[in-house]
C-alpha cells in the first residue's frame, strides 16, 4: 500500500504534456526515486535510424565521467602474461578453454567480455551464447585487444556500452539516484555526445528525435532534446 502511494505521488508530480529541460528532469527523477534501494537513473533515446540496414547500426562504448554506481563484472579470455595482466587489473574471471567450458555449461559470471585477438577462434565458438547477451567481444568496441589492462580498467571505471535496438531506441543506466544532480547531468551529456559521434552516414533527417528520463521505479518524463547537449 505504501509503495502504491509513493508511486501515485510520483506520477502526480510529472506533467505528461511537458518536455522537461534536462536539469529539471534529473532533479525530479531524483525526488521520485522513493524505493528502499538506490534506484538507477535511466534514459531512453529514440534515434532517426533504421537499424534493419547494416550501415545504420549505432553501437559504441563511452566512459561516464562519474561512473555508474554499479560494480561491473569483467571476464577475460587470455593466456599467459595477458591473463596475469587481466587479473592484476581487476578482472573477475580469467581463462581460456576452462572459461569457454564454463560458458558452454551456462555459467556466465561477467557483464563485459574481453578477449585477446589470439583467443577469438575459441571465443567465436561461443557466439550463439555470448551474442544474444551482448557479450561477444568486438574489436570496434575495444573488447578484442592486446591492451587487456586498459580494457579492464575502463570497464571497471564506469564505461558502458550503448546499442540501438530494432526500433532505433537506446536505453542506458547513467548513474544512481544518490548521485549529485550535476554528476548525472555530466554522465548524460557524455553519453549523448558519444551517440552523436556514432551517427551513421546513412541516417537522414533528425537524428536525436525523442528522449525520456526516469528512475528504476519512477514515472518517465519526456525531455527537451535541445537541452541534452551543451
UniProtKB/Swiss-Prot annotation:
Pfam families reported in the protein's UniProt record: Ribosomal_L1 (PF00687)
One Gene Ontology cellular component: cytosolic large ribosomal subunit
InterPro entries on file: Ribosom_uL1_bac-type (IPR005878), Ribosomal_uL1 (IPR002143), Ribosomal_uL1-like (IPR023674), Ribosomal_uL1/biogenesis (IPR028364), Ribosomal_uL1_3-a/b-sand (IPR016095), Ribosomal_uL1_CS (IPR023673)
Gene Ontology terms, MF aspect: rRNA binding; structural constituent of ribosome; tRNA binding
CDD domains reported for this sequence: Ribosomal_L1
GO annotation terms (biological process): regulation of translation; translation
Keywords: Repressor, Ribonucleoprotein, Ribosomal protein, RNA-binding, rRNA-binding, Translation regulation, tRNA-binding
Superkingdom field: Bacteria
Task performed by this protein: Binds directly to 23S rRNA. The L1 stalk is quite mobile in the ribosome, and is involved in E site tRNA release.
Family: Belongs to the universal ribosomal protein uL1 family.
Record text on subunit structure and interactions: Part of the 50S ribosomal subunit.
Protein name from the UniProt record: Large ribosomal subunit protein uL1
Gene source species: Granulibacter bethesdensis (strain ATCC BAA-1260 / CGDNIH1)
Upper taxonomic lineage: Bacteria, Pseudomonadati, Pseudomonadota, Alphaproteobacteria, Acetobacterales
Amino acid at each position: 500500500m505504501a509503495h502504491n502511494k509513493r508511486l501515485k505521488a510520483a506520477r502526480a508530480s510529472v506533467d505528461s504534456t511537458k518536455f522537461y529541460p534536462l536539469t529539471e528532469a534529473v532533479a525530479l527523477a531524483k525526488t521520485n526515486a522513493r524505493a528502499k534501494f538506490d534506484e538507477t537513473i535511466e534514459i531512453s533515446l529514440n534515434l532517426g535510424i533504421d537499424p534493419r540496414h547494416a550501415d545504420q547500426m549505432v553501437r559504441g562504448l563511452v566512459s561516464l565521467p562519474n561512473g555508474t554506481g554499479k560494480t561491473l563484472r569483467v571476464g577475460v579470455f587470455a593466456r599467459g602474461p595477458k591473463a596475469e595482466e587481466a587479473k592484476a587489473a581487476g578482472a573477475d574471471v580469467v581463462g581460456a578453454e576452462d572459461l569457454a567450458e564454463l560458458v558452454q555449461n551456462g555459467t556466465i559470471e561477467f557483464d563485459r567480455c574481453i578477449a585477446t585477438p589470439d583467443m577469438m577462434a575459441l571465443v567465436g565458438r561461443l557466439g550463439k551464447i555470448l551474442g544474444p547477451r551482448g557479450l561477444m567481444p568486438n574489436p570496434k568496441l575495444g573488447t578484442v585487444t592486446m591492451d587487456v589492462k586498459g580494457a579492464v580498467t575502463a570497464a571497471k571505471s564506469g564505461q558502458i556500452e550503448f546499442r540501438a535496438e530494432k526500433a532505433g531506441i537506446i536505453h542506458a543506466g547513467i548513474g544512481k539516484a544518490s548521485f549529485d544532480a550535476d554528476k548525472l547531468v555530466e554522465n548524460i551529456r557524455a553519453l549523448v555526445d558519444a551517440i552523436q559521434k556514432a551517427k551513421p552516414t546513412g541516417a537522414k533527417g533528425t537524428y536525436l528525435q525523442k528522449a525520456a528520463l526516469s528512475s528504476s521505479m519512477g514515472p518517465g518524463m519526456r525531455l527537451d532534446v535541445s537541452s541534452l547537449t551543451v
